[in-house]
Regions:
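Membrane-associated feature with strongest affinity for ZDHHC
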Residues: 1-287
Length: 287
């Protein structure tokens, strides 16, 4: 993962325009394909075999999977459509007051003073309010105004892949694929060698899906843990200092807005943020 991350950062720095031209659509198509695949695999293949299609439990799983898929895509779309740039501030807020001018810094690219915690993004080509990072899956920067959507995006991606993993595991245990089926690497070797054994192909399919599912839930889980730590300290991806940490309740309110954790229900829930992202209260340090 570190090698992949370094490789992506290298190409991003080399040619930002070309990078986002390909990285954004590829990432979004991949996410869409993965969501549709896991939903279809679980609802139309695994669950009918495990619990049938007549009972209430199957219908409940349908609803849960639909809610998860909706929140993945709705939060992703909200991230994409929300403007976090400094330029969105009212004109009177683009100029710092006398008592806060020392907290602002000059952006060489934008040629202007920008608020604290605002940083320039070479992909968006503007300064972002409380910039966290640029996300290729949402094709936008994650900042003050859309951080809430990004957190729930990572939450529901993790939840969805975790539910799929549990269902996959139950299916494989039912048919003893984990216990008696050939090992994953051995399956690939046999498949490449051209074996026509139906059991080998059957186990290969299940093992490939399970391995991809395991990788997906691990990657999404790492993202979720990282974002949880950021919210806990009111920090950002590149700035982990605790100078803006005002306590868990206030930190949640700053990122999630007035509705707080109820925003997990849907990105359409109105939840005004406590401020516009230009002024940040520092933590009081008692000596």
């Amino acid at each position: 993962m570190c090698v992949l991350s370094d490789l992506l950062q290298y190409y991003a720095k080399t040619d930002p325009k070309k990078f986002i031209r390909y990285a954004h659509p590829i990432s979004i198509v991949f996410l869409f394909a993965a969501t549709v695949f896991f939903f279809t695999w679980e609802v139309f293949f695994l669950l009918p075999d495990l619990i049938g299609t007549e009972g209430w439990f199957y219908k409940a799983n349908w609803i849960v999977d639909l809610v998860i898929a909706y929140n993945v895509w709705a939060n992703m779309l909200a991230c994409y459509r929300t403007d976090c740039s400094v330029a969105r501030l009212p004109k009177d807020r683009l100029v710092p007051g006398p008592d806060e001018k020392h907290l602002w810094h000059h952006c060489e690219d934008c040629k202007q003073l920008v608020p604290p915690r605002s940083w320039h993004c070479k992909f968006c080509r503007c300064c972002i309010l409380k910039r966290d990072h640029h996300c290729i899956f949402t094709a936008n920067c994650i900042g003050h105004n859309n951080h809430r959507y990004f957190f729930w995006f990572t939450f529901y991606v993790t939840l969805g892949t975790a539910v799929a993993l549990v269902t996959n595991f139950a299916y494989m245990v039912k048919y003893n694929i984990l216990l008696h089926g050939p090992a994953f690497i051995f399956n690939i070797f046999i498949w490449i060698s051209g074996s026509n054994s139906p059991m080998v192909k059957y186990n290969l399919k299940e093992n490939v899906v399970f391995s991809f599912n395991l990788f997906s839930v691990a990657l999404a889980g790492i993202m979720l843990v990282n974002q949880t730590c950021i919210i806990y300290r009111n920090a950002s991806f590149y700035k982990r200092e605790g100078r803006y940490d005002l306590g868990l309740r206030k930190n949640i309110n700053i990122i999630m807005g007035k509705a707080g954790l109820w925003t997990f229900l849907s990105p359409s829930i109105k939840s005004p943020l406590p401020h516009d992202g230009a002024q940040w209260q520092l933590r009081k340090i008692i000596k």
